[in-house]
From Swiss-Prot:
Residues 1-39 form the signal peptide. A motif (LPXTG sorting signal) lies at residues 891-895. This is Clumping factor A. The modification Pentaglycyl murein peptidoglycan amidated threonine is found at T894. Keywords: Cell wall, Peptidoglycan-anchor, Secreted, Signal, Virulence. Residues 71-111, 162-199 have a biased composition (Polar residues). Residues 895-928 form a propeptide. It is a peptidoglycan-anchor. Residues 40-542 are annotated as: Ligand binding A region. Belongs to the serine-aspartate repeat-containing protein (SDr) family. Residues 47-65, 117-131, 142-161, 565-597, 857-875 have a biased composition (Low complexity). It is found in: Secreted, Cell wall. Residues 34-199, 528-899 are annotated as: Disordered.
C-alpha cells in the first residue's frame, strides 16, 4: 500500500514535470514568433514610409493644407504627450528616453481622438512622461530635408482629412483596429489609441524618418539649438548698406547702422541658418558686457533668432514660421560700434559687411578726439563697460596724458552734478587701480588698456573716500609731482533701484609752473541705441570753477563756467612804505629780468605821460662810496633838444667831499651841435670855496669841432666872491686844434646864486666804457613836484666797472618843468682820478643865447699858479702861456712898488679874507 502511494507520487511528480516542460516550450516558441513579427512590421513600415514620401511630393497636397492645420497638430501633440506617458510606464527604464522621442515622431500618423479620450489620458500623465530626449531630438533635426517638409505637410493634411487611405493602409498592415477607429466612435477611441500606440512604439525603436512637426514650441526652446542647413547663399534679393556720416566719434556715442534685406527661399525649414559678416573694426555690444542682436520679427511672431559667434559675425536661425509661410522677406537694422581693441588710433577705416557674396563697404574717419587740457592739467575718461545683470561698470581715466609737469596732483571722482546718476561710490562698492605710463605715446586713443603693459602703482598712491559718493587719489611721488601719464581704472557698482543713468565726473587738481592751484574736469555719460542694450559714453571736457585756496579740493564740484584764458601769478619780495599819487599813461615794450629787494620811504606826486622804446644791454660792476651833504633850492624851467655824438674813454678814481648850498634860477636857450673826440688823463686836487652872485643873459649858437689831447695836473685853491650881471649875445665860429699840457694849482672859494632858464635841443650818440671806483653813503629827504613830458629814443651800449665810496647828505626842494626831446647814442671810455673838497654857495641868474662855431688845434704846456678870481681872464696869464711856450726863460723883472701903504692895504685885505675863509669852513663843518 505504501508502495502504491509511492508509485502514485512518482507518477504525479513525473506528470507535473512533463507539463512544465511543455508549457515552457510553448512560451519560448511564442516569444520567437513575436520577434519575427516585429521585424516584419518594421520592414513594412519603412517601405510604406517611402511610398508616402513619393506620394506626398504632390504640390497640390501642400497647398491644400488649410491654416487650421496648426490647431489639429497641437491636438495631436497633446495626444502624443499623453501616449508617451502611458507607453513609458510599461517600458523598461533603459528604453524610456528613446521611446518618448520615437512616439513623438510617430504620433503624426494617428487619427485624432475624441475630447473624452483626450481628457482621460491627460490625467494619467506623470512628470516623467513630459520629458523629451535631447539626443533623439537632435538626431531628428539633423535628418531634416525638403522631403520631410512635404511629408509633414501631407501628414498635417491627413489629420484634417481622414480620406487619406495611405496612412490607413500603413497602420492596417500591423493592426486592424487602428484602421477601423473613427472620430465619431467614442467607445472605441481609447482602444484604438492604445493599440496604435503599441504598434508605434515598435516602429519607433528603429525608425529614423524625421517628424519635426511633432515638436511643440516650448520643447524646442528647452532643447539645444537645432542644427539645420546653412542657406546663406540661397537667400535672394539681398541688399546690404552701411549708414553713417563721414566721421564717427566713438567717445561721443557715435555708431554705425548696418542695414540688410533679403528674401527667404520657400524650401527653408525650421533650424536653417544664414550668416551676416560683420567687419572686425566693429562690435555689436558697445560698452555692454554681453552683445545681443535683434530677433527678426513677423508681427508678433519670431521669424529668426540671432547669436554672435566667436569671430564676431551674426548667425540667424529660422523658427517654424518658415514652415508654414511662402515668399518670406526680412529686413534687419543693427547698431554697430567702433571696436577699441582693433581700432586704437584716430584715422580712416574701411568697413566691409555682407550676406554671402553680396557686400557693402564704406570708408569713415574714426575720431577719438583729444583729451581736455587747461594750462598744465590734462585729463580724459570713458565708461568702457556696463553689466546690467551684475549692476557693475568700469571707467578708464587718463591722468596727465600730455606728460606735463604737475605739482601736488590730486584726482577726485564723483557723480556728475545736476544729474540723477545711479553710480554708487564708496569703499564697499568701488575698486580703483592705478598704472604708471612711462611714455605718453604708449597710450591708445581708443582707451583700450592692457594692464600687463604698464606698471601697477596702486599700492604707492593714497586712495580715500573723503565724502559721500566721492573718491580721492593722491599721487605720492618722491618729489610730489608727476611728469608722465597715469591710468586710473575704476570698477564700480550701479544702484539697481535708481531710475537715473550712469553719469560721472573726474577732476584733476594741481599747481602749475607759477604755483597757481588749478583744476580740470571731464564728464562721462552713457547713451543706449535702438533697444540693443548697447551704447557708448558722451564725453565733454569741463573747466570747473577754480579753487580759492591752494590745495583745496571741492567735496562735490558743481557746474561752473570759467575763463580758461585766465592766468595770474606773482612772485615778490619787497619792504616798502610809500605814499604816492600818480596819473600816468605809458606805452612801453620792454624785455627785462630783475631780482630786487628794496626798502624805500618816499613822498612823491607825479604826472607823467611817457612813451619809451628802449633796447639796452648793460654790463656793470660798481662799488660806490660817497660822502656828500647838499642843501639846494632850485627852480628850473628848461626846454632842451640836444643832438650829440660823443666818444669818451674815461678812467676815473674819485674821492670827493663836497658841501654846497646853491640857489639857482636859470633860463637858458641853447642850440649846440658838437662833435668831439677827447682822450684825457687828469689828476686834480682842488679845494675851492666860492661865493658868487651872477646874473647873465646869454644867447649863444655854437658849432664846434675840436680834437684835443690834454694831460693836466692841477692843484688849485681859490676863494672867490663874485656878483655878476651879464647879458651877452655872441656868435663865434672857431676852428681850433689844441694840444695842451697843464699843471695848475688853484684854491677857490665861491658863493653863487644863479637863476637860469634854458631851452636846449640835443641829439647825442654816445658809447661809453667807464671804470670807476666809488663809495657812497647817502641819506636823502626829498620833496619833489615834477611835471614832465618826455619822448626819448635811446640806444646805448655801456660797459662800466666802477667802485665808488660816497657819503652824502642832501636836502633839496626842487620845482622843475621840463620838456625834453633827446636822441642819444653814446660810447664813452673814461679813466679819471679826482680828489676834491669843495664848498660852494651860489646864487646865479643867467640868460644866455650863444652861437659859436669853433675849430681849434692847439698844443700848449703850462705851469701856473692861479691868481684870485678877480684877475682878468685875458690878461697876463694868456701872454704867460704864449711866452712860456716860445721860451723857457724866466719872466722879466718888472720891478716892485715900495709904497708902504699899498703893502699894508693888501696885508689887511689878506687877513680879512683869511678870517672869512676860515670862518666859512668852520660853518660848513658845523653844518656837516
Amino acid at each position: 500500500m505504501n508502495m502504491k502511494k509511492k508509485e502514485k507520487h512518482a507518477i504525479r511528480k513525473k506528470s507535473i514535470g512533463v507539463a512544465s516542460v511543455l508549457v515552457g516550450t510553448l512560451i519560448g516558441f511564442g516569444l520567437l514568433s513575436s520577434k519575427e513579427a516585429d521585424a516584419s512590421e518594421n520592414s513594412v513600415t519603412q517601405s510604406d514610409s517611402a511610398s508616402n514620401e513619393s506620394k506626398s511630393n504632390d504640390s497640390s497636397s501642400v497647398s491644400a493644407a488649410p491654416k487650421t492645420d496648426d490647431t489639429n497638430v497641437s491636438d495631436t501633440k497633446t495626444s502624443s504627450n499623453t501616449n508617451n506617458g502611458e507607453t513609458s510606464v510599461a517600458q523598461n527604464p533603459a528604453q524610456q528616453e528613446t521611446t518618448q522621442s520615437a512616439l513623438t515622431n510617430a504620433t503624426t500618423e494617428e487619427t485624432p481622438v475624441t475630447g473624452e479620450a483626450t481628457t482621460a489620458t491627460n490625467q494619467a500623465n506623470t512628470p516623467a512622461t513630459t520629458q523629451s530626449s535631447n539626443t533623439n531630438a537632435e538626431e531628428l533635426v539633423n535628418q531634416t530635408s525638403n522631403e520631410t517638409t512635404s511629408n509633414d505637410t501631407n501628414t498635417v493634411s491627413s489629420v484634417n482629412s481622414p480620406q487619406n487611405s495611405t496612412n490607413a493602409e500603413n497602420v492596417s498592415t500591423t493592426q486592424d483596429t487602428s484602421t477601423e477607429a473613427t472620430p465619431s466612435n467614442n467607445e472605441s477611441a481609447p482602444q484604438s489609441t492604445d493599440a496604435s500606440n503599441k504598434d508605434v512604439v515598435n516602429q519607433a525603436v528603429n525608425t529614423s524618418a524625421p517628424r519635426m512637426r511633432a515638436f511643440s514650441l516650448s520643447a524646442v526652446a528647452a532643447d539645444a539649438p537645432a542644427a539645420g542647413k546653412d542657406i546663406t547663399n540661397q537667400l535672394t534679393n539681398v541688399t546690404v548698406g552701411i549708414d553713417s556720416g563721414d566721421t564717427v566719434y566713438p567717445h561721443q556715442a557715435g555708431y554705425v547702422k548696418l542695414n540688410y534685406g533679403f528674401s527667404v527661399p520657400n524650401s527653408a525649414v525650421k533650424g536653417d541658418t544664414f550668416k551676416i559678416t560683420v567687419p572686425k573694426e566693429l562690435n555689436l555690444n558697445g560698452v555692454t558686457s554681453t552683445a545681443k542682436v535683434p530677433p527678426i520679427m513677423a508681427g508678433d511672431q519670431v521669424l529668426a533668432n540671432g547669436v554672435i559667434d566667436s569671430d564676431g559675425n551674426v548667425i540667424y536661425t529660422f523658427t517654424d514660421y518658415v514652415d508654414t509661410k511662402e515668399n518670406v522677406t526680412a529686413n534687419i537694422t543693427m547698431p554697430a560700434y567702433i571696436d577699441p581693441e582693433n581700432v586704437t588710433k584716430t584715422g580712416n577705416v574701411t568697413l566691409t559687411t555682407g550676406i554671402g557674396s553680396t557686400t557693402a563697404n564704406k570708408t569713415v574717419l574714426v575720431d577719438y578726439e583729444k583729451y581736455g587740457k587747461f594750462y598744465n592739467l590734462s585729463i580724459k575718461g570713458t565708461i568702457d563697460q556696463i553689466d546690467k545683470t551684475n549692476n557693475t561698470y568700469r571707467q578708464t581715466i587718463y591722468v596727465n596724458p600730455s606728460g606735463d609737469n604737475v605739482i601736488a596732483p590730486v584726482l577726485t571722482g564723483n557723480l556728475k552734478p545736476n544729474t540723477d546718476s545711479n553710480a554708487l561710490i564708496d569703499q564697499q562698492n568701488t575698486s580703483i587701480k592705478v598704472y604708471k605710463v612711462d611714455n605718453a605715446a604708449d597710450l591708445s586713443e581708443s582707451y583700450f588698456v592692457n594692464p600687463e603693459n604698464f606698471e601697477d602703482v596702486t599700492n604707492s598712491v593714497n586712495i580715500t573716500f573723503p565724502n559721500p559718493n566721492q573718491y580721492k587719489v593722491e599721487f605720492n611721488t618722491p618729489d610730489d609731482q608727476i611728469t608722465t601719464p597715469y591710468i586710473v581704472v575704476v570698477n564700480g557698482h550701479i544702484d539697481p533701484n535708481s531710475k537715473g543713468d550712469l553719469a560721472l565726473r573726474s577732476t584733476l587738481y594741481g599747481y602749475d609752473s607759477r604755483f597757481v592751484w588749478r583744476s580740470m574736469s571731464w564728464d562721462n555719460e552713457v547713451a543706449f541705441n535702438n533697444g540693443s542694450g548697447s551704447g557708448d559714453g558722451i564725453d565733454k571736457p569741463v573747466v570747473p570753477e577754480q579753487p580759492d585756496e591752494p590745495g583745496e579740493i571741492e567735496p562735490i564740484p558743481e557746474d561752473s563756467d570759467s575763463d580758461p584764458g585766465s592766468d595770474s601769478g606773482s612772485d615778490s619780495n619787497s619792504d616798502s612804505g610809500s605814499d604816492s599819487g600818480s596819473d600816468s599813461t605809458s606805452d612801453s615794450g620792454s624785455d627785462s629780468a630783475s631780482d630786487s629787494d628794496s626798502a624805500s620811504d618816499s613822498d612823491s606826486a607825479s604826472d607823467s605821460d611817457s612813451a619809451s622804446d628802449s633796447d639796452s644791454a648793460s654790463d656793470s660792476d660798481s662799488a660806490s662810496d660817497s660822502d656828500s651833504a647838499s642843501d639846494s633850492d632850485s627852480a628850473s624851467d628848461s626846454d632842451s633838444a640836444s643832438d650829440s655824438d660823443s666818444d669818451n674813454d674815461s678812467d676815473s678814481d674819485s674821492d670827493s667831499d663836497s658841501d654846497s648850498d646853491s640857489d639857482s634860477d636859470s633860463d637858458s636857450d641853447s642850440d649846440s651841435d658838437s662833435d668831439s673826440d677827447s682822450d684825457s688823463d687828469s689828476d686834480s686836487d682842488s679845494d675851492s670855496d666860492s661865493d658868487s652872485d651872477s646874473d647873465s643873459d646869454s644867447d649863444s649858437d655854437s658849432d664846434s669841432d675840436s680834437d684835443s689831447d690834454s694831460d693836466s695836473d692841477s692843484d688849485s685853491d681859490s676863494d672867490s666872491d663874485s656878483d655878476s650881471d651879464s647879458d651877452s649875445d655872441s656868435n663865434s665860429d672857431s676852428d681850433s686844434d689844441s694840444d695842451s699840457d697843464s699843471d695848475s694849482d688853484s684854491d677857490s672859494d665861491s658863493d653863487s646864486d644863479s637863476d637860469s632858464d634854458s631851452d636846449s635841443d640835443s641829439d647825442s650818440d654816445s658809447a661809453s666804457d667807464s671804470d670807476s671806483d666809488s663809495d657812497s653813503d647817502s641819506d636823502s629827504d626829498s620833496d619833489s613836484d615834477s611835471d614832465s613830458d618826455s619822448d626819448s629814443d635811446s640806444d646805448s651800449d655801456s660797459d662800466s666797472d666802477s667802485d665808488s665810496d660816497s657819503e652824502s647828505d642832501s636836502d633839496s626842494e626842487s620845482d622843475s618843468d621840463s620838456d625834453s626831446d633827446s636822441d642819444s647814442d653814446s660810447d664813452s671810455d673814461s679813466d679819471s682820478a679826482s680828489d676834491s673838497d669843495s664848498g660852494s654857495d651860489s646864487d646865479s641868474s643867467s640868460d644866455s643865447d650863444s652861437e659859436s662855431d669853433s675849430n681849434s688845434d692847439s698844443e700848449s704846456g703850462s705851469n701856473n699858479n692861479v691868481v684870485p678870481p678877480n684877475s682878468p681872464k685875458n690878461g697876463t696869464n694868456a701872454s704867460n702861456k704864449n711866452e712860456a711856450k716860445d721860451s723857457k726863460e724866466p719872466l722879466p723883472d718888472t720891478g716892485s712898488e715900495d709904497e708902504a701903504n699899498t703893502s699894508l692895504i693888501w696885508g689887511l685885505l689878506a687877513s680879512i679874507g683869511s678870517l672869512l675863509l676860515f670862518r666859512r669852513k668852520k660853518e660848513n663843518k658845523d653844518k656837516k
